[in-house]
């Protein structure tokens, strides 16, 4: 009994009467009254005072911060008002009619309470009960306050009291707070009534009525939607569904998601079924709040500052949950004491103990669920912050080479920078780094965000550890500190393991970056890799990196084993030391009550210790990933917003010097002074490598400005510009040398965020010569271009990119050699109708080109560049007169309408949607054409058994799994024996135990014997458990190695169509996130699942053995388990699959932003792309958010069911107290304590396995994709010996729904013949090469080489037997040698020889070249080239070379391995005409006996060939000698030559060639 003065709080087994009167009926209600009244008054007064200023019907407004500069204006999320306004709308989530009716019921109950209190108060006054009426008076005033509050809540709908809406939520909170407090206070008096302690009939009725009315009011408010928030959700479209309005009950028990779970149970979910996010969880709101709370500096302090409220809440909830979790352990000694002596305590008191265990566990479960959900919501929000910041940084990051970060510290630096790089070149310059960016976004951001969950677990672990030690001290005295010291002694070992683990993790991430970089490079260049038959080369290269990664994973597994062993053995060691000190040094008797209470505490202590181990590991990984993100965010940013100066009258350079990097070898533009003519066509010309593209990038502010000034029309964001009367803005549009397209339709790529105007759109399509292409496409302008434009030809891509610039509202156009990929006829048409036509009225255009005769024809201003300097500039007519180079170029090349550059990007090499029969298309946009949609498919239903079997087969079959599970049963049996050993140890002195077989074994032994045996059992159990985990992880690592190899092989050898229709981001998702899941999460979860199932089965069997009556409870409890698990698993499975699918678009957005960052910045369109990223993040966050809610839904219910198991076990024990000994009861309760956690762990791990298995499904899906059909007849070693090629009736289409790319094509090429293939863009020229290389399956027909059907030749043998110079000049990360001769088949002399032949180095004696390489001091005046030696670094994609130089290197690669057949696909389009002529001469002289098929737009390149093949609409229209065709006025070839503008030269060259061959 505890006393306070003369009033005891507790009398034997119940609350004392004076305590009830003083505290329950007076002081506590007075506190509720005062706090509620003060809070309500303050809120109502504030709302009334601000009644004219508050607008509750508006979306949230965020005050802008920042320095007001242009960079801030472009990238600050606070400026994205369009995301709140025009691009979305607020949807009102109104309260239901029933909810409104509930308020009237609530008011009626309050009036009833007032009536009851008035009646009882009047009765007390009549009886003159002074003390009583004080409490009742306070409670009556409290109900009057609540009546006022409900009245204000009811009248808020009136127009006269609209101001009340501002405080409606606060008034609702006062009501809920009061009802909950009053109901809580009524519980103990109600118990007193039930156990008969209160005899007064009026008081009994009052207490019962008070309790149930309070309960009714509490349930009314708990199940009604929370008032005060009308505009709860922000949605992107009207079809987006809103979740149910939040209720207290729904929030606390996570019942808000019930409808979604039931829906998932009934049928499969789709994206349309996923509810929208709360406005506070929208990415724009998260980022706006984060930006306002952040300061410049490191990311970690800003994260802590932003999430401080979440951390404080988690801290409080962890404290409450941790303390309440120990209530059962505190009550356990009293229950065991009752079992030991049932007469020592009353039944009422013991039942109170058991009920308190139930209530405390329910409250602890609720607090824990809320704390974890706060962490999971924080995880989503932090992930949003990190991904958005990384994406924004990607748009701000400089394209220059000096932006290298620690992500690639060991990457070798490149040599002289690219002077003619284009849009894609800056991207590819750092492609290795860019692929690392993908890891930063997809892996590091996720790992860091998971730390939000870790924080709660860490707090809980600390609180639980401290609480457990305090209770142990109260139970065992100072001996508990001995165990504490042992615990502390293990911490340095843990940190030692953590340090090694962190180092291995950092090393692994570096290798992961390298691996994904290699995979990304392979995917981006897959067509060229297949042409070169280099699949195995890249396979081995990537596998070698993967092997290093696997070795580190195994090292991490070993460290994890040691760490796991330390912490798993910890409780045994601590308990053994504590017990030994307790017995030996304190001379105390260790009773079952003390021992098993301590053991329950040690068992509980195992959880926080395990959490500490895993938390340390996770935090180390998170900090490493955070540092990687910080390194990326610290990278150099573009300085364009600082160096560009705005001018309305000047557009150009003033004595400007620019460079790519601060290095002596870096290419520089020197003393550039150009004033481009406004409203005119300005042309920039110069030889290959002169710096034309660099000049344009300098004008865009992308290069380092060393001196001088750059003047542009504007540096403001596109959204901030005013539209003029002519419909244009003072902005710039950029069309890069390499066409950059986004995944979407043709219309999406052309309109590109502008307002759609059909007339303008049609005019642009026509002027860019796209109208006929659109008509030939089944879906018209709704045709999906594929990833980066894969479904289009290179010329189509280039024209679409040009159309985007023309369609834009920009008054200033910057076009980088945008006509190089189209035929002469198309080029001339575009130049005349587009660049010099009505679409350019009032616009300033700057264009670069090698086609001097074409661009000078109608240009108003001409700039001649050479070696980074302006040699001359002025009107074309003036320069032609004074400049011999121009006169010679024009005389030699006349008006050739072909240009200098072919498409670089890997996507442009694909020629998938070719022009078929125009009559078969439809030009009407309004027609709902069938669009071939390549959306990612989602598996439905449960994870198929085939997926589990597929994974098990890699482990060795289901037998191995059975053996593994059986070992878990044996190991946990050993663990349980520890408790039974302790029981027999404690019972050895009792008479009841002397008849047992165990007693006869242990009789006569000392406590040391028992203690050592206890330790040995624990050590064996810990070692076996940890060893099993280690074996599982090591085995899993070996399995993932095989799976990765299978996946990589499947992707590399897949048909090219798979790569054409599958976005790279989607494939990379398999290799990054999905593979990471299998590497590090799946197997540990499988192991944890098997162990937890075994533990639960043991516990149920044990409880059922000791108390068979428990089985009556077990049946309905198991039914409950099954029900909630079934509901959850179906929902979580569907949500996880949608989550996996919705992440891919974020990968795609990143990939597109990296590729097109220069174009995006040039268009000043950063805000729109940031907004798109936020929409994609929200779509990804929605299933992720509700998946986490569903996880807490099941966790809460499993915890409650587990609490019922503990409760029912306790009831069974006290009911059988006279039949049980305390030791057995202690074992029973100790295991019952751990049952809840174990059962929860089963559900969580099983659901995790189900969810993680979706990654296995996704990887399995990509391991089953069709591979290229391989031949089975190996030809002779010298095949092809002569080089005869024949195509017979060949038809080819790239997809079942597309037009034929080749339609019944037949022609024959004799050995040694050189054939030029010509035709307009999309005619099917490149499809001939695709057919010969078997890149696509033919519909019908045959191709024979030396009379052998190539369909039966093994693919690698076929492709290695043919030389090819592809349209895409693709180079790979490495050196000059590795790009030319990756298999080391040729000598340095041979390599230098071909470099000299293609003009990359000047003529020089081969011995001189080698000598100069070996003697750095030796200098040859003849050797002036960019290639210092064959080990010179080549960046991925050849980004540190100009476009022309890349083409020359590819030409050299093909000539080095020249075969009897060579296929050339526009290989010289991006070099100047003089170099082209030299190369053509080299080809003719060095390959006289080689069969050559050349696709060319430059007719001069093939005019002296043996044959010309004219293609049109996929058909062979003409095939004869050039002179024969050009002599016939009715031929297509004659028309092409006429349109080229150099007919006389072509005719003369053809005649000379014809005469020479006669």
Swiss-Prot record:
User: In which residues is ATP bound?
Assistant: 686-693, 1319-1326
Q: Is Nucleotidyltransferase among this UniProt entry's keywords? A: no
Q: Which residues form the ABC transporter domain?
A: 651-892, 1285-1538
Q: Which CDD domains match?
A: ABC_6TM_VMR1_D1_like, ABC_6TM_VMR1_D2_like, ABCC_NFT1
Q: What are the glycosylated positions?
A: 4
Report the Gene3D superfamilies cross-referenced here: ABC transporter type 1, transmembrane domain, P-loop containing nucleotide triphosphate hydrolases
Which PROSITE patterns does the record match to this protein? Answer: ABC_TM1F, ABC_TRANSPORTER_1, ABC_TRANSPORTER_2
- The record places the following residue ranges in the Cytoplasmic compartment, namely 51-103, 152-169, 223-302, 375-449, 505-558, 606-953, 1035-1082, 1133-1199, 1244-1558
Query: Which residue stretches does the UniProt record annotate as biased composition, category Polar residues?
Result: 892-901
Q: Which stretches of sequence are listed as region Disordered?
A: 410-434, 892-926
The GO cellular component terms are: fungal-type vacuole membrane
| Protein family (similarity comment) | Belongs to the ABC transporter superfamily. ABCC family. Conjugate transporter (TC 3.A.1.208) subfamily.
Q: What is this protein called?
A: ABC transporter NFT1
Gene name linked to the record: NFT1
């Amino acid at each position: 009994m505890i006393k306070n003065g003369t009033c005891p709080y507790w009398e034997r087994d119940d609350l004392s009467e004076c305590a009830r009167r003083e505290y329950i009926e007076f002081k506590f209600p007075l506190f509720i009254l005062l706090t509620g009244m003060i809070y309500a008054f303050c809120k109502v007064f504030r709302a009334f005072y601000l009644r004219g200023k508050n607008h509750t019907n508006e979306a949230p407004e965020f005050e802008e911060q920042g320095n007001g500069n242009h960079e801030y204006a472009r990238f600050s999320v606070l400026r994205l008002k369009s995301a709140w306004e025009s691009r979305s709308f607020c949807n009102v989530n109104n309260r239901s009619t029933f909810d409104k009716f509930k308020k009237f019921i609530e008011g009626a109950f309050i009036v009833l309470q007032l009536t009851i209190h008035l009646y009882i108060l009047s009765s007390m006054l009549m009886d003159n009960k002074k003390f009583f009426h004080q409490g009742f008076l306070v409670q009556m005033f409290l109900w009057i306050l609540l009546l006022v509050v409900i009245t204000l809540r009811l009248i808020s709908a009136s127009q006269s009291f609209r101001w009340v809406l501002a405080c409606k939520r606060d008034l609702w909170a006062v009501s809920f707070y009061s009802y909950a407090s009053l109901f809580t206070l009524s519980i103990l008096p109600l118990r007193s009534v039930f156990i008969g302690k209160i005899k007064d009939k009026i008081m009994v009725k009052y207490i019962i009525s008070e309790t149930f009315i309070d309960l009714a009011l509490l349930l009314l408010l708990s199940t009604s939607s929370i008032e005060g928030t009308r505009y709860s959700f922000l949605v992107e479209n009207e079809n987006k569904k809103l979740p149910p309005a939040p209720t207290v009950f729904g929030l606390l028990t996570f019942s808000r998601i019930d409808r979604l779970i039931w829906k998932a149970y009934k049928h499969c979910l789709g994206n349309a079924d996923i509810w929208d996010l709360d406005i506070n969880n929208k990415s724009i709101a998260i980022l706006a709040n984060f930006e306002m709370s952040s300061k410049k500096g490191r990311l970690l302090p800003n994260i802590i500052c932003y999430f401080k409220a979440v951390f404080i809440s988690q801290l409080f909830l962890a404290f409450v949950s941790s303390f309440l979790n120990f209530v059962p352990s505190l009550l356990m000694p009293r229950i065991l004491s009752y079992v030991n002596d049932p007469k020592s305590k009353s039944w009422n008191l013991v039942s109170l103990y058991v009920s308190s265990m139930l209530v405390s566990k329910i409250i602890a479960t609720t607090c824990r669920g809320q704390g974890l959900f706060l962490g999971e919501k924080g995880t989503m929000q932090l992930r949003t912050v990190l991904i958005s910041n990384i994406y924004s940084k990607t748009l701000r990051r400089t394209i220059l080479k000096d932006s290298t970060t620690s992500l690639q510290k060991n990457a070798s630096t490149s040599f002289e920078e690219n002077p003619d790089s284009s849009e894609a070149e800056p991207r590819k310059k750092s492609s290795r780094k860019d692929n690392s960016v993908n890891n930063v976004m997809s892996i590091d951001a996720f790992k860091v965000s998971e730390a939000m969950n870790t924080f709660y677990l860490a707090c809980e672990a600390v609180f639980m550890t401290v609480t457990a030690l305090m209770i142990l001290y109260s139970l065992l005295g100072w001996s508990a500190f001995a165990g504490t010291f042992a615990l502390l002694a293990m911490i340095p070992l843990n940190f030692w393991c953590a340090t090694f683990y962190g180092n291995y993790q950092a090393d692994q991430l570096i290798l992961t970056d390298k691996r994904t970089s290699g995979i990304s490079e392979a995917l981006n260049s897959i067509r060229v890799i297949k042409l070169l038959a280099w699949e195995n080369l890249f396979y081995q290269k990537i596998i070698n990196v993967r092997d290093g990664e696997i070795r580190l994973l195994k090292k991490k597994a070993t460290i994890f084993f040691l760490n796991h062993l330390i912490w798993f053995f910890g409780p045994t060691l601590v308990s053994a030391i504590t017990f030994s000190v307790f017995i030996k040094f304190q001379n105390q008797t260790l009773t079952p009550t003390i021992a098993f209470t301590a053991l329950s505490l040690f068992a509980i202590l195992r959880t926080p210790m395990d959490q500490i181990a895993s938390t340390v590991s996770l935090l180390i990984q998170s900090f490493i990933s955070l540092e990687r993100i910080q390194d990326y965010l610290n990278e150099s940013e573009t300085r364009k917003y600082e160096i560009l100066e705005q001018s309305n009258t000047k557009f150009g350079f003033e004595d400007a010097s620019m460079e790519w990097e601060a290095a002596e070898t870096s290419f520089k533009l020197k003393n550039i002074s150009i004033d481009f003519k406004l409203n005119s066509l300005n042309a920039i010309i110069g030889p290959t490598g002169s710096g034309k593209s660099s000049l344009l990038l300098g004008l865009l502010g992308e290069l380092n400005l060393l001196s001088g000034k750059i003047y542009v029309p504007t540096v403001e964001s596109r959204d901030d510009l005013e539209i003029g009367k002519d419909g244009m803005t003072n902005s710039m549009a950029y069309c890069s040398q390499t066409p950059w397209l986004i995944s979407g339709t043709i219309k999406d790529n052309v309109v590109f965020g502008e307002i759609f105007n059909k007339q303008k759109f049609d005019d642009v399509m026509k002027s860019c010569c796209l109208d006929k292409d659109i008509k030939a496409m089944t879906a018209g302008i709704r045709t999906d271009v594929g990833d980066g434009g894969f479904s289009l030809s290179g010329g189509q891509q280039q024209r679409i990119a040009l159309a985007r610039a023309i369609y834009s509202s920009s008054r200033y156009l910057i076009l980088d050699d945008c006509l190089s990929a189209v035929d002469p006829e198309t080029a001339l048409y575009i130049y005349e109708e587009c660049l010099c036509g009505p679409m350019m009225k009032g616009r300033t255009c700057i264009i670069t080109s090698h086609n001097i005769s074409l661009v000078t024809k109608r240009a108003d201003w001409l700039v001649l560049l050479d070696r980074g300097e302006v040699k001359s500039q002025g009107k074309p007519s003036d320069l032609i007169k004074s400049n011999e180079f121009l006169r010679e170029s024009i005389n030699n090349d006349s008006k050739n309408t072909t240009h200098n550059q072919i498409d670089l990007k890997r996507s442009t090499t694909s020629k998938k949607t070719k022009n078929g029969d125009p009559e078969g298309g439809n030009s009407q946009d309004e027609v709902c054409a069938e669009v071939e949609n390549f959306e990612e498919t989602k598996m439905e239903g449960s994870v198929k058994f085939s997926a589990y079997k597929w994974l098990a087969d890699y482990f060795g079959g289901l037998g191995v799994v059975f053996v593994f599970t059986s070992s878990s049963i044996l190991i946990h049996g050993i663990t349980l024996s520890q408790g039974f050993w302790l029981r027999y140890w404690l019972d050895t002195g009792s008479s009841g135990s002397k008849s047992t077989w165990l007693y006869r074994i242990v009789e006569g032994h000392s406590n040391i014997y028992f203690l050592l045996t206890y330790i040995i059992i624990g050590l064996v159990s810990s070692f076996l458990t940890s060893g099993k985990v280690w074996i599982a992880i090591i085995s899993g690592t070996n399995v993932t190695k095989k799976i990765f190899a299978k996946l990589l092989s499947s992707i590399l050898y897949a048909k090219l169509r798979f790569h054409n229709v599958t976005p790279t981001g989607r494939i990379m998702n398999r290799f990054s996130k999905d593979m990471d899941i299998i590497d590090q999460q799946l197997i540990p979860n499988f192991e944890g699942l098997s162990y937890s199932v075994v533990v639960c089965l043991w516990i149920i069997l044990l409880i059922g053995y000791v108390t068979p009556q428990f089985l009556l409870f077990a049946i309905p409890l198991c039914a409950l388990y099954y029900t909630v698990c079934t509901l959850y698993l179906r929902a979580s499975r569907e949500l996880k699959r949608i989550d996996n699918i919705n992440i891919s678009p974020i990968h795609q957005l990143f990939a597109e932003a990296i590729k097109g960052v220069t174009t995006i910045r040039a268009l000043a369109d950063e805000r729109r792309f940031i907004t798109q990223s936020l929409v994609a993040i929200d779509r990804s966050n929605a299933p992720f958010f509700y998946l986490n809610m569903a996880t807490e839904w099941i966790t809460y219910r499993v915890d409650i069911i587990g609490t019922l198991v503990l409760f029912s076990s306790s009831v069974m024990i006290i009911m059988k107290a006279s039949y049980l000994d305390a030791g057995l009861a202690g074992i029973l309760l100790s295991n019952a304590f751990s049952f809840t956690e174990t059962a929860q762990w089963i559900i969580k791990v099983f659901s995790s396995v189900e969810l993680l298995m979706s990654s296995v499904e996704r990887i399995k899906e990509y391991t089953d994709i069709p591979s290229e059909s391989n031949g089975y007849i190996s030809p002779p070693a010298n095949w092809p010996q002569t080089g005869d090629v024949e195509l017979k009736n060949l038809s080819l289409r790239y997809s079942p729904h597309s037009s034929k790319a080749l339609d019944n094509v037949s022609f024959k090429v004799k050995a040694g013949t050189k054939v030029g293939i010509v035709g307009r863009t999309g005619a099917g020229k490149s499809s001939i090469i695709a057919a010969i290389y078997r890149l696509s399956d033919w519909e019908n027909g045959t191709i024979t080489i030396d009379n052998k059907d190539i369909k039966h030749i093994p693919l690698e043998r076929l492709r290695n037997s043919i030389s090819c110079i592809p349209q895409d000049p693709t180079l790979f990360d490495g050196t000059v040698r590795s790009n030319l001769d990756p298999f080391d088949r040729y000598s340095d002399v041979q390599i230098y020889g071909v470099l000299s032949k293609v003009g990359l180095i000047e003529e020089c004696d081969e011995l001189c070249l080698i000598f100069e390489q070996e003697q750095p001091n030796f200098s040859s005046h003849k050797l002036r080239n960019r290639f210092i030696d064959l080990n010179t670094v080549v960046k991925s994609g050849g980004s540190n070379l100009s476009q022309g130089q890349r083409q020359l290197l590819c030409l050299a690669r093909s000539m080095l391995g020249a075969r009897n057949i060579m296929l050339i696909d526009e290989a010289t389009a991006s070099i100047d005409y003089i170099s082209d002529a030299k190369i053509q001469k080299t080809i003719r002289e060095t390959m006289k006996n080689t069969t050559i098929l050349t696709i060319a737009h430059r007719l001069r390149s093939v005019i002296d060939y043996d044959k010309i093949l004219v293609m049109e609409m996929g058909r062979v229209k003409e095939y004869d000698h050039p002179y024969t065709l050009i002599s016939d006025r009715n031929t297509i070839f004659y028309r092409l030559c006429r349109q080229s503008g150099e007919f006389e030269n072509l005719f003369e060259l053809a005649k000379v060639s014809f005469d020479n061959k006669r």
